[in-house]
């Protein structure tokens, strides 16, 4: 069974629209499970064979069941400006990466206890 999850929220640097990538801890493996995209502009989109495309309530699209493992359980991100507003959101917390590390390369790593 899957364990805890978190989502990376941000505003697309070209369109300014909100984008979401949601990850889960799948028995010690970081896995991209689903993604929200407001439209398919500026590099966003769905690729056949990579998840299931569904319409989101209120507009936009969810790509469900992507289930793509993240290499080495580590996601490398260059944190965007305050306008991009990168943030990690869980059921209980929100961490604003743009406020903490604007324009900095960070690694988001799954802690497996090893």
Predicted regions and their residues:
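N-terminal secretory signal peptides
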Residues: 1-38
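Mature, soluble, non-transmembrane domains
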Residues: 30-33, 44-114
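Mature extracytoplasmic/periplasmic domains
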Residues: 40-42
